[in-house]
């Protein structure tokens, strides 16, 4: 192919990774752990927890889609078949104020984690509730395939904003992401 240089520079160019991301990806593939500062370890642990919480939310939404004939009919009507639903991990957030919260927010630490990922909101009285309700859910993946945010499309025309996206978080910066890029790169 005519490429030259190191494995790190190859990953930086081919996968458009930053230097540290390329080093971490190569280490992960080789089964080697990259040493980090203790302060960094605490931050990395929180980020890993956020990735895990978002992945758990995506799985919950996929199960809820399997249980919702109405949501599947909506997607069928839009030409989104079962193969594409699976390929893009499309799901459904049930119509309830605490479905996600009850399923994944099992203690105070997990509730705070779900708030940091933008999956829960808090009203003026301090009541915490699911941000996404009665919406087809589109997980947004980073370039490494990790779920970092969601876009939700309302099923009923008059039920709030047509599209609702995750807020910017430590993992998600809207201007830096392109929906579906990870899936296209897998093809």
Regions found by a protein language model. Give the residues of each.
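Acidic, glycine-rich loop-and-beta core segments that form the ion-binding/anion-interacting portion
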Residues: 160
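Non-catalytic accessory segments of DNA primases and related replication-initiation nucleases
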Residues: 1-116, 127, 135, 150, ...
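Short, acidic loop-beta-alpha module within alpha/beta folds
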Residues: 8-9, 20, 69, 73-76, ...
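Aromatic- and glycine-enriched glycan-recognition loops and surfaces
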Residues: 130
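Long, structured ligand/cofactor-binding scaffold of large enzymes
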Residues: 119, 155
């Amino acid at each position: 192919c005519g490429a030259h240089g190191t494995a790190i520079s190859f990953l930086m160019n081919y996968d458009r990774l930053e230097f540290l991301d390329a080093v971490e990806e190569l280490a992960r593939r080789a089964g080697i752990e990259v040493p980090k500062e203790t302060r960094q370890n605490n931050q990395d642990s929180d980020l890993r927890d956020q990735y895990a919480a978002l992945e758990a939310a995506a799985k919950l939404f996929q199960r809820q889609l399997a249980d919702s004939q109405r949501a599947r009919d909506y997607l069928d009507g839009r030409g989104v078949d079962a193969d594409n639903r699976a390929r893009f991990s499309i799901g459904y957030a049930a119509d309830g104020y605490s479905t996600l919260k009850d399923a994944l927010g099992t203690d105070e630490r997990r509730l705070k984690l779900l708030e940091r990922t933008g999956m829960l909101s808090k009203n003026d009285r301090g009541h915490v509730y699911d941000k996404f309700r009665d919406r087809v859910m589109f997980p947004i993946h980073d370039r490494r395939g990790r779920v970092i945010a969601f876009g939700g499309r309302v099923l009923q025309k008059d039920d709030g904003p047509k599209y609702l996206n995750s807020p910017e978080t430590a993992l998600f910066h809207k201007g830096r992401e392109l929906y579906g890029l990870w899936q296209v790169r897998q093809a």
